[in-house]
Amino acid sequence: MPRSNRNDNFIDKSFTVMADLIVKLLPINARSKEAYVYYRDGLSAQNDGDYAEALENYEEALKLEENSTDRSETLKNMAIIYMSNGEEERAIETYRKALEENPNQPSCLKNMGLIYEKWGRIAEEGGEQDSADRWFDQAADVWTQAVRLNPGGYLDIENWLKSTGRSNVDVYF
């Protein structure tokens, strides 16, 4: 049974029905429509916490999807799952792939920075200050890119950049 038929949430189900109608009416090819169905089912599974099913659907969507922006969104969602499962290196790799498809994804950069900053704190707590500084610098690098793409969208990151002395004046313009 398609995932859309199992969704009990009225708003989600309404959205799914509307999206399905739009996809049926739009003049897009069958391959793109099928990719969308896999993506939609992956998103639904991800929202339900069924990450294995979500990843399976996202993998199928990637096999069919040709649009780089849509591929990037699918990869970003996969990376979010890897990140939440503690597969941080795999998440970083997948965020990079998403950015190759669409470099205008500040949320990918933000999430990569969260991982680097976490690794920096772990290294710092372990007394490895040089390693910590390298991770913090990597976090600052990707976060600076994220802030440039989305000025004012990540105030917590802007504050971290300023408070750690890793801020550039031009970041905010």
From Swiss-Prot:
Membrane topology: Peripheral membrane protein
Each TPR repeat, start to end: 35-68, 72-105, 120-153
Keywords: Membrane, Photosynthesis, Repeat, Thylakoid, TPR repeat
Localization (cell): Cellular thylakoid membrane
Role played: Essential for the assembly of the photosystem I (PSI) complex. May act as a chaperone-like factor to guide the assembly of the PSI subunits.
Sequence similarity: Belongs to the Ycf3 family.
Protein name according to UniProt: Photosystem I assembly protein Ycf3
Protein's organism: Synechococcus sp. (strain CC9605)
